């Protein structure tokens, strides 16, 4: 019998931004990693911990942060480019019915999901996970899969952490799906909230009275609120200071997507009022049709929006919204969100060690990322640093810089083909370039699903809009006799003719049209797009 393998030990050095508190920065230090966890955080000049005496740290030449945690992103849609929003809307049900939305978002995604011959799902999950990792995101929302008849659902297991999968008991699973029957019954909905550690709920997305009614629907006729400490309200754009006070009284939280709010509504959540009320706030980039390309981009949007509207958020506040705050909202803060002994080694290293450490991350571009680790495993980085860290994987380029990315995982979803990023990119480009041909097959499959005559085995995408997943998490509680949830039929497979579209670029650096498209978005207040472009 061969001896059991010992723990994997390695280390990396650089400037360390722990995010434990503002100013808690080690100008030069080393993080020692044993298997999936941080064994020690040691300033320069102090001895290595026991067991690491002969370990040579990887000199990153960069600043080390906790990996970014995103609490709002519909990853399945992140192959689509920015939608040119034709007008400002009052609530999400309005833009869902726009003709250009159906041909730019609903139609293409239905074609990809329902006309899939088995080659597109593996390509899509590979591509959208890469979009996260190359921008330093180590946790995001999960990708929902369904069997072909739509009766069984699960979350895809890949290289990223998924909030809805977690790793119990250390990282409890978040809830982010409400079956209609639960949402229509106030008591059942409230019970669901009480039993959850974190409930990610789309809440009052929009700026009009109808959007606000979704919040009022959380109150029953007796005056009790279905608001619990587990509730993390995504968007909350229709809420005012009084509403945020109600949320704070019940210890709820807020997830903010400033760029998406402005693109669709021309206004954003009153996060200053939310903060004044004492609410914890996290960031989410939403999705590529109306949002930042990644969470690193959303940090920039948050800074620009805060300055534009004089919201008063510091650079530390903004970085906290993508690290310590979301970890606390998920109840993961004992294991993630800050850099400390015993926590999981989910880390992000950005080139350079000078200047304000929080502004340094906000200003960084995708091509400035040196290394990303998840659970102590080097997942993405420069070719040189990945080699020194013992990582391996597929070669790619970000701008003109050589990078390596590793998707492999022992518990990766066994039912999904493992394809390279290059192959995934090729498949998706071809599919999006032939949407008209795919549309016929997708309409036929949609009809077969509706009639219950589907005989295919395996898994397909369960698109958020059509199957009531993440995007539909607003409550559908009765309010003055009216259902407050959206009509899923309104976003069913479209028969509007589809035309070829281009695959959304993996990064801003690799997308020559992203910033110009953003500048042409009519709902953005003057200066927002230009302010974001300055960072690139």
Residue ranges and their predicted role:
Residues 1-51, 73-173, 187-192, 320-536:
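Active-site microenvironment of metallo-dependent hydrolases
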Residues 46-65, 70:
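Active-site metal-binding motif and surrounding structural segment of the metallo-beta-lactamase
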Residues 61, 132, 247, 254, ...:
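Conserved, mostly hydrophobic/aromatic
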Residues 67-78, 198-205:
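Histidine-centered catalytic micro-motifs
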Residues 142-289, 307, 312:
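Active-site core of metal-dependent hydrolases
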Residues 252, 278-279, 309-312, 316, ...:
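Charged catalytic cores and adjacent phosphate/nucleic-acid-binding surfaces used
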Residues 264-267, 292-295, 338:
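Alpha-helix N-cap/helix-start motif
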Residues 276, 284, 291-306, 368:
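Active-site loop ensemble at the mouth of alpha/beta enzyme cores that anchors a bound cofactor
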